[in-house]
Amino acid sequence: MITREMIRNGFESGTVSIEEEYAGCIGICCRIGDNAFYFLGSEDDDLTKEEYWESYTLDMTIDMIFNILKDVESAEEHGLDETELDYYISVLAA
């Protein structure tokens, strides 16, 4: 299970970051380890990384990521399968 603390620690260690383009993502995405996923709504599709951080705090970002990765159902609702979720759990738990 992923916790907000795990995500915060990931940001602090560099394991988690917000990227504009990474691993096939076009636009803002969340990178965890070597993979990435979209986590913003379509209204923010055209933000740059700098604009993102002007609009959202780290705590807001952690909450958004947590709400996607908190369980299999939430992950699947956001287009992530169980294998991807397991990968993110293993990276954040390391």
Predicted regions and their residues:
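Short linear interaction motifs
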Residues: 3-21, 82, 89-90
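Intrinsically disordered, low-complexity coil/linker segments enriched for acidic/polar
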Residues: 3-6, 48, 57, 61, ...
